[in-house]
């Protein structure tokens, strides 16, 4: 599958807000479409133009309480629930990082992954991300992973 990116539309945001992930990934469910429109989100489409994922960068991708670091681009991304766990995470994250690099020209890229989400950590690791630390919010713990661009 190849991915194309576009600015997120209102219809895209409504679709994403309707996506439901199986446990324990339900924390990625997003009930509020307006949240996506208030920030700079991008929709990812497949070859047929179907919405298959989304991504965001910088402040929009940064977990609450995590400080901005000069030269570091925070990246957030999500695949449609029916496309998770089937080997698309690596190619998707690779293309998201390429888009982030093209738009923001960072020195490093950082992803913040819920500590229980071993699947996403393995995807990031396979793309050269290394664990750099941890971050904790009142709701959960996260693993910080980064790589040079």
Indicate residue ranges for each PLM-predicted region.
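Acetyl-CoA-dependent GNAT
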Residues: 7, 14, 18-82, 99, ...
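Solvent-exposed beta-strand sheet faces enriched in polar/charged residues
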Residues: 58, 110-112, 132
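Conserved acetyl-CoA-binding loop of GNAT-fold acetyltransferases
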Residues: 125-135
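Extreme N-terminal starter segment of soluble prokaryotic enzymes
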Residues: 1-3
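Conserved beta-strand-loop-alpha-helix junction that forms the acyl-donor binding cleft
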Residues: 110-121, 138-139
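Conserved acetyl-CoA-binding loop-helix of GNAT-fold acetyltransferases
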Residues: 85-99, 122-126
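Conserved beta-strand segments that form the floor/walls of ligand-binding pockets within enzyme
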Residues: 74-78, 110-112, 144
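Short hydrophobic/aromatic beta-strand or adjacent loop that forms the aromatic wall/cage
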Residues: 39-41, 139-144
């Amino acid at each position: 599958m190849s991915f194309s990116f576009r600015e997120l539309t209102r219809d895209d945001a409504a679709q994403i807000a309707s996506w439901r992930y199986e446990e324990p990934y339900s924390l990625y469910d997003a009930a509020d479409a307006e949240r996506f429109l208030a920030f700079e989100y991008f929709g990812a489409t497949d070859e047929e133009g179907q919405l298959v994922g989304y991504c965001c960068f910088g402040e929009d991708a940064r977990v609450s309480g995590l400080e901005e670091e000069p030269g570091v681009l925070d990246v957030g991304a999500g695949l449609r629930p029916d496309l998770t766990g089937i080997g698309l995470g690596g190619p998707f994250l690779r293309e998201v990082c390429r888009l982030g690099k093209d738009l923001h020209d960072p020195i490093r890229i950082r992803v913040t992954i819920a500590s229980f989400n071993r699947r996403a950590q393995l995807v990031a690791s396979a793309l050269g991300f290394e664990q750099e630390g941890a971050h904790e919010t009142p709701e959960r713990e996260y693993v910080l992973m980064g790589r040079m661009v």
